[in-house]
């Protein structure tokens, strides 16, 4: 027991049953004060100096204190409550504050304390940051209450990391020195006047036009401007912003500096591009079908925020929150250096993401949880996203009590161990401080921060909507509530910083500025593009890469992939499998299987200077234990990545096992590729069946982004697909959905049957990247075919040639009466059946590329068959699924009533496949035999 027991116990602080523990902690404190929590450091310091001589007041009232509790303990409980629950009483609601029920006790009286008692206690007991500022605990607690119950409410006590909690406590409780001088306040008012004036002008001159006004959370714009300035102070030159439609036009105009003339032109349906700045600083793209104005993004290169920065606002569909992982991926791409050997290096200070959410959608859309889960993962971290919830406390017509089960819309973020700052959107200077705290935290800890910007919505969901139909009571108060422009202007008038005339002059000047811009536009200059033709670069299918390789070149690569460090111990069982990859180069009849073909393709692509990033669940090994891109030492668990050691490598290879998420990971990879168009981004599904968890990414980004926004992507999808008796959830990648989305040469969809064709396909896709011809590639990748000898090919098929849209057999054309078209595993099943049961009247064709459909190639084959009678399409999917409904119009045109056209496959089904493996075999056999014999 401590030698200082007498000194300790004589201090009249009653620890009751915890005395023994406290004595031990006091011993630790005397040896090293930093070894105990800061609250105890303060307490122990008062004991040591005799400041703790306060008589305990036994009580059983108010604060729930038990008889014998000390005054100090009650003070500390009050302080803890203020820190933990002060946000519930904070002044964060500009209008219509909610009624809180059962709020924890937060007042001095609740703990049987009073001013007289507290004035006898050192302020250090309240916070170590107050010791030299306030004379006593009472003054310090008053300060604490103002801080924790003021216009910024803090939630950080849920964070597990003590270092982060201590940092936040110090930052919050250290008296804040206002960062804004009088001139800066004037500028801030002018910015608000432009934000508000922009909305007022549009509201007056384009009555009922949808713009999804920012009014009610107007301070978002100066918050973004200040964030970008602070980022510039850190040397961050790339800012990636994602947001939905509310306030988007204002952000485009006042953050990305899109000219008023361009924005007004869009409302007038005239050509806005006539007003695009000639200096090239503003990049705005649009596709041939385009999109509504409040979905469009842009990129601005500007010096307006202190240094030259590239500010990007991501294009966005109406699907709320779905852009979040896209922005994260774009940011990571900007941070990664892929022009080096091995894996990429990541610099979090090169770029940062700002993701703007809605209060109804943030807790409502699961994509947010998936995206935040990426935040600290090696393959996905961006060094911290700044999340701003534009909280207008309503979702269309739905109020919070119907929209979420939590106190705040931000509560879902607590599970990710990040700080949350709620701030009153009408307190302009508080919003600026919130941004400063958030940016300092991100810089210190490289973690996400959430700011809940609490405001209101001035009008309905859109400007044609009448909110009083469903929300009459809130809107009675909102209509009477002054805008933040007026509130802040009056505040500056009261402070003597500006006069009332100056305030009104600034407000009026914005309307004049917009009127001047409006007058420059010729209302008769209407846009007229009824044909909406796709660009010339998309007129042709993906072109084959015809580069030849010598046998020795590929052998050198293969040998390097099997050359491990001397002290690295590959699992013996695995090593035997990998050593077989030498056989194609050393043994007659040796074949290159699917995984080896992929590795050789990747290596040659890296030699060409194209970086590769492959992610997905279990992708390092491969779901079917085929890839083994990352090897693990069986003795110590160390890893080795052979593709980091390719001879003459010119770019990085990056591979990561993804979290168990589809939507966010696909969105991340899409964003990465949009930002770094020269990078070969690949997402691999664990099973293709699970890819539909990302359907909105396929629908709204991958397939349509170029047509809508002019946004090019070359993202590649590997989707394991084949009917192998594993049931309806492990058979189908829903090929039919990708074919339904295919149009205007917007993608390439393949179902391959040859390892060499896979090799050439990957090289063709890599060669197209960062060109106008680039487009997504969707691969129905194999499962059992990964090790199939019919799929494996000799090395001479890799040294030359190119990708083949169809594969035919050598056959006597005079004997052929039937052509069977099939793809993927169905083709292999038929090929192996015919190998055992030869039939020279049948020509089997592998349709490797389903989209764009190889009409001309098939047509040429059919023309060469003088006695052809029947063309059959064979698939293993049900008739209402797979490729049949897509290929039918093409085949109907090809046969042109000259031949019979028949379908062989499963009948129409609600579920893709049979659940019983034996029944599957019977059905599969029936399809094969029927297609051959009928």
From Swiss-Prot:
For this record, the Gene Ontology CC terms, alphabetical, are: cytosol; oxoglutarate dehydrogenase complex
Similarity annotation: Belongs to the alpha-ketoglutarate dehydrogenase family.
**GO function terms (MF aspect):** oxoglutarate dehydrogenase (succinyl-transferring) activity; thiamine pyrophosphate binding
Quote the function comment for this protein.
E1 component of the 2-oxoglutarate dehydrogenase (OGDH) complex which catalyzes the decarboxylation of 2-oxoglutarate, the first step in the conversion of 2-oxoglutarate to succinyl-CoA and CO(2).
**What does the record note on quaternary structure?**
Homodimer. Part of the 2-oxoglutarate dehydrogenase (OGDH) complex composed of E1 (2-oxoglutarate dehydrogenase), E2 (dihydrolipoamide succinyltransferase) and E3 (dihydrolipoamide dehydrogenase); the complex contains multiple copies of the three enzymatic components (E1, E2 and E3).
So what EC number does this one have? 1.2.4.2
Kindly list the residue ranges recorded as spanning the membrane.
none
The alphabetized list of GO BP terms reads: glycolytic process; tricarboxylic acid cycle
> Which InterPro entries does the UniProt record give?
2oxoglutarate_DH_E1 (IPR011603), 2oxoglutarate_DH_E1_bac (IPR023784), DH_E1 (IPR001017), KGD_C_sf (IPR042179), ODO-1/KGD_C (IPR031717), THDP-binding (IPR029061), Transketolase-like_Pyr-bd (IPR005475)
- The name this protein carries in UniProt is 2-oxoglutarate dehydrogenase E1 component
